[in-house]
Amino acid sequence: MRRKKYPIVAITGSSGAGTSTVKTAFEHIMLRENIKAVFIEGDSFHKYDRFEMKKKVNEYKKKGGYLSHYSKEANLFEDLAELFKTFKFTGKGKRRYYLHSEEETEKWEGLKPGQFTPWEEISGDYDMLFYEGLHGGVEEVAPYVDLLIGVVPIINLEWIQKIHRDRTARGYSTEAIVQAIKARMDDYVDYITPQFSRTDINFQRVPMVDTSNPFIARDVPTADESLVVIRMKKEIIKKYDIDLTYLKNMLEGSFISRRNTIVVPGPKMGLAMEIIVTPIIQHLIKTSEL
């Protein structure tokens, strides 16, 4: 059977926003539907490795500026768009890996954590591409995406997550983290938030506890202490005949807040995604074949 195109699904959102929950949900869908997907991490399309980035940040600071991983200057948007375009019509393309830890370097002799592997051609017979990272919905990339999903907590929760992650995993002081948040705010406004107006479906986690001052919060609100607001484009609801009343009945404790929005308990986020997205993925795979 000849392919017409290879579907591309992109999850866009900051690290710690819940994109890992989304990836797990998609892995469940792929397994059940017997779909083979190539997974692309957004980190692999940063322009600089960890060591080069530190040098570039210092160079920008000396000039009175700031460079962050949110910005176009620190990423390979055109290369990512080229991968999506090529894969969409051929099932192939160039990819590489970003090595986060010592464990990940074991397969790559001579490379250290924070470095990239060499570029390589995607090998294997895949049905679709799944992207998870910061920039799946930037204007250069979005035209090639068949299903764009945003995962974004409210901003105070995102800051709490970043502060706790950077303190515990990276050893940064709260003061240093707050300065980084302030310094990259322009890039967040310019490059991150516009993507969520392009998404087909948004998942936004909202804590049900006081997060009014995220810089002194002692704990990250748990899923049990949160609700998830799921907003779907009206075009998506119509195209895939999504029944919000059915979803409300399937997901205990949920309610419809607008004609295109359902609110579910935090622990139900993964299940909600599987119920909503599975028929969309089935349709994308079915219509990709001639």
What are these regions (language model features)?
Residues M1-Y6:
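Phosphate-binding P-loop
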Residues I8-T12:
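Short hydrophobic/aromatic beta-strand immediately N-terminal to the Walker A/P-loop
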Residues S15:
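The conserved Walker
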Residues T19:
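Conserved lysine of the Walker
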Residues V22-K23, E27:
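Post-Walker A alpha-helix
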Residues I35-E41, F45-E106:
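Conserved nucleotide-sensing/catalytic segment adjacent to the nucleotide-binding pocket
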Residues P113-G124, P143, I155-N156, I160-L290:
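C-terminal accessory "lid"/substrate-recognition subdomains
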Residues D125-L129:
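Loop/turn-to-beta-strand initiation segments
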